[in-house]
């Protein structure tokens, strides 16, 4: 009997913010990192392609628009390449955690220029779709879900929004989120446990006709 993996609903919703790039093993990542350190531009590009979606998913809730999130992602990778010579792999530590720490810091620098995170919520008021054979129905649902996710996240305190975004948008483990944010791992776990059901309930509420 085939067992299908159950996708966490928050992971599925965050996936709407950016499409995944190629999947790399950690060994492959380390080979690319070492090659990029030596100036191999194709290795640097492979790292970018593999991780840009996760960076975008992690920083989009921290930014006021998709354009700002894209700028933050680009600046993140400029910093990654500039500081790559300082990166030292440690057993059990993942390269993506280092990248997303830089992304989080970059997003917070950008946010210092404005203290409110407005979210375009027009898409939340789209007309109800017909359940007929409209080929755009699924796309419309995705637009509404994406907008609902961003609205729900924007209502969280900055600390909790950052933790949730790194955890489910960036795919980091609790200890990696703790290292990226300077919070204790137990506090990160408590934030995730508390906010996850709240977010899902709020998103469901926003999607009600």
Q: Positions of the model-derived regions?
A:
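Hydrophobic recognition helices of helix-based DNA-binding modules
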Residues: 55, 59, 80, 84, ...
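Conserved RNAP core-binding helix
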Residues: 28-30, 45-48, 56, 66-83
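Arg/Lys-rich amphipathic alpha helix in sigma70-family domain 2
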Residues: 82-90, 100-121, 142
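Structural recognition of an alpha-helix C-terminal capping motif at a helix-to-coil junction
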Residues: 71-78, 82, 93-105, 190
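Intrinsic, short, N-terminal disordered tails of RNA polymerase sigma-factor systems
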Residues: 1-38, 42, 46-49, 111-115, ...
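Sigma70-family region 2
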Residues: 37-38, 61-65, 77-92, 113-115
């Amino acid at each position: 009997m085939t067992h299908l993996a159950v996708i966490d609903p928050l992971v599925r919703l965050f996936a709407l913010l950016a499409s995944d790039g190629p999947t790399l093993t950690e060994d492959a990542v380390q080979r690319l990192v070492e090659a990029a350190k030596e100036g191999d531009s194709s290795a640097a590009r492979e790292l970018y392609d593999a991780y840009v979606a996760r960076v975008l998913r992690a920083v989009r809730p921290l930014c006021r628009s998709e354009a700002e999130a894209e700028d933050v992602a680009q600046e993140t990778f400029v910093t990654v390449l500039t500081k790559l010579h300082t990166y030292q792999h440690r057993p059990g530590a993942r390269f993506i955690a280092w990248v997303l720490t830089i992304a989080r810091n970059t997003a917070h620098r950008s946010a210092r220029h404005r203290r409110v995170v407005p979210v375009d919520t027009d898409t939340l008021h789209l007309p109800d779709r017909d359940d007929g054979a409209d080929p755009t129905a699924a796309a419309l649902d995705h637009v509404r879900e994406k907008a609902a996710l961003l609205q729900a996240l924007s209502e969280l305190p900055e600390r909790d929004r950052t933790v949730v975004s790194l955890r489910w948008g960036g795919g980091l483990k609790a200890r990696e989120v703790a290292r990226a944010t300077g919070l204790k791992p137990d506090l990160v776990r408590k934030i995730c446990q508390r906010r996850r059901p709240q977010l899902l309930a709020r998103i469901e509420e926003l999607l009600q006709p």
